[in-house]
Amino acid sequence: MGPEGSNLKFSENGCDFWALENSYYRKGFFVDIGASDGITASNTYLLEKFYKWEGICIDPNPSTLKSMCGARDTIVSDLCVYNESGKILPFKYLGDQSEFYGWNLRSGIDGLVSKDMPVKMNDHKVFTITLTDLLELYNAPNKIDYISIDVEGSEIEVLTGLDFSKYDVKMFSIEYENEENRAKIDWIMSRNNYNRVDFDQQCTEDRYIKNG
């Protein structure tokens, strides 16, 4: 379901409307890490296009960068969010193979991305940046309403690169690859004063809201 009176649907699991409801439908600021082509299953497209949110879309996948730039009016970055800035890392992506629709949007850091892919993936090199450094680079506000993380295995690396004392983030949605990663994510979030809410056992995505 999309904006009132329409059948539009963007976010796969309704994270866009969840973010809207918990921000009382006011204009906000988002960070979309793993934004892919900017539209397909996007947690932030509706926020930007229909509710005038501002934000940053990040994805180092070279096969979706052009589409993301064309689809979004907000800041777009092809840097790779990681736990250390200034590294060059091997990166895997599937690319334009329509017979594997859905899979073709999957990509990630080599060694962290799932190996459960239908075909051999392409190789790429990416430049890394911590989430803190990225937010500083693009002059993000210190108060951020919503961060969406969908990075195919490197969720821990993204979170450990964020200075939680510097940036006051109200909400996170975080996809996880397995239960081991999920437990580590939950530990990081709980020690930084976040509660896990609205999780669905059928989905590999958890939502967090900051206490207070």
Residue positions per predicted region:
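Phosphate/nucleotide-binding beta-alpha loop and adjacent structural elements of enzyme active sites
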Residues: M1-G212
